Amino acid sequence: RLIRRQRQMCIRDRATSASGLFYAFQSIVQLARESGSGTYRLPEVTIEDAPRFSYRGMHLDVSRHFYTKEFVKKQIDALARYKLNRFHWHLTDGAGWRIEIKKYPELTRETAYRPFPDWKSWWNGGRTYCRQDAPGASGGYYTQEDVKEIVEYARQRHITVIPEIEMPAHSEEVLAALPQLACGGDLKPGGEFCPGKELTYEFLTNVLKEVMELFPSEYIHIGGDEASTNHWKQCPDCQALMKAEGMKEEGELQEYLVSRIEKFLKENGRKMIGWDEILTGELDETSAVTVWRGEDKGAESVKRGLRTILSPGAYCYFDSYQDAPRTQPEAIGGYLPLEKVYSYEPVTEAFPADKLDCVWGVQGNVWTEYIPTPEHVEYMIYPRLLALAEVAWTNLEQKDWKRFHAEALQEVKVLNSMGYHTFDLQNEVGNRPVALSVDNHLAKGKKVEYVRPYSDSYPAGGESALTNGIHGGWVYTDQRWQGFLGKGADVIVDLEKSQPIQQLSIDFMQLRGPGVFLPQKVSFLISNDGKEYTLLKTITTTLPITDEQLTIQTYDWTGSCEAHYVRVQADINPEAGGFLFTDEFVVK
């Protein structure tokens, strides 16, 4: 409780905790306004405040690109300012090992540097590593003294640093330095440790021993996400372990590894966190889960009584575009504007009411594949971090987007004055204009026949998706864009009666990275009996499939005709393959 009246100020912390006092002072700092004479003034105010969630976190991937100790400390300052209290430090991944481990110096010696200036060049250029003194070497790592300094710096600001050491997947860099930890068999090494070798557990526990000496955190994050079983199927050691343990599927090997590491951490007075893939196995009640794949995984974790950190990609992945993609630096994809982050409500009806205390909190994530510089990292984080902080701290009934947006505009200026490189919120473009309103055209609400089926992976609105009057936004994952594989799309709309038509149009998307391409050609046809169709126009795509920028292209016909049925055919480019995505078949 903070009370400011005339010349008096009183701070009362019911929990009498140092963190409570610290957060009260953060409120004072945010309330203070420079008077113009070198002093600051506070308004008369009474504030009674407490956080909604006890875990309020932010994640930073330093493997894809390395950032200095000073940069990390600068971000910790911002977390403290906005009352976040966990820093999830993603220290290892296939793109580089970033923490000194004295028992295994080859980890940093051989894989902390790459002969490429950025991740994208490395990914497309052979994914090799080099030593620090090699020509063109790029990268770095944190010494154990660096780690101790950062951990202490965070502690002084009431932030717990949680290290992540990836296993069993995302470990290409380890296998490059220590190939004896890879699977046997005919396949070349992938990104997964061999869970069938006892040497793997010796390595992992030795690494974790040093990590635990550096990080006093209650929890250690072990990754656990996106493991492939391809190598395990062909590995003699993995198959021998499966036989000895009575396993039926290779996925059980991951559960076995996770269980052994969980037990090791518990024996050493620590607890385990993993990404939500660890839910496939039995977990100790002390373990926690970072949920990134959506509400159903969060509900499963909560129902099982596990501490649950909610961090869904749709709301909490700050590596997504935050504005119209063509106005922004290259990103991994997606579209996550400030308003959507702010709209996130972690607790849903899918969570059992008697287990809501298992919702530990929320976390934002910054994966840095396409974020090569410190300035770019800050650009992606701020001001979205402000929205995350309010989601984590403020009760739902107290949230107000208009109030928050006005405050965020001012806070961006403060951050800029403090040396942070923020997104230009004042000049935000926003979502795709046609996605902001309903298009009341002649085919809206009419029945659609799919001559070629849409993909079950991207159904959007199902059989009404292309005639519901709703256009898609900037990303194909917004559940407005319908996806097609195979030969492409071929749909017929029944207008219910013959009527005059002056225009037919349909949009398609191209985004080369995830394999989304414009059609090779689009044809518009009409019919009055639903059997014989007359071709109105065929349009051939001219944009090359090598173009990597997001493109949304409209294909249309204009003229004068009468028709009962309208049809559009869009053929997949055989040279490109991949998906077609479209959002609305407009008839006027």
Where are these regions (language model features)?
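Extracellular/lumenal ectodomain signal focusing on beta-strand-rich modules
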Residues: 44, 57, 106, 361, ...
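Acidic, glycine-anchored loop motifs typical of Ca2+
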Residues: 440, 456-475
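Short proline/glycine- and polar residue-rich coil/turn motifs
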Residues: 542-549
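Substrate-binding cleft of carbohydrate-active enzyme catalytic domains
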Residues: 54-270
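Aromatic, loop-rich ligand-recognition surfaces of beta-strand-rich domains
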Residues: 472-537, 549-588
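Substrate-binding groove of N-acetylhexosamine-processing glycoside hydrolases
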Residues: 149, 158, 169, 201-219, ...
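Extended acidic/polar, glycine-enriched regions
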Residues: 12-50, 67, 86
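Single conserved hydrophobic/aromatic residue that forms the stacking wall/gate
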Residues: 1-7, 11
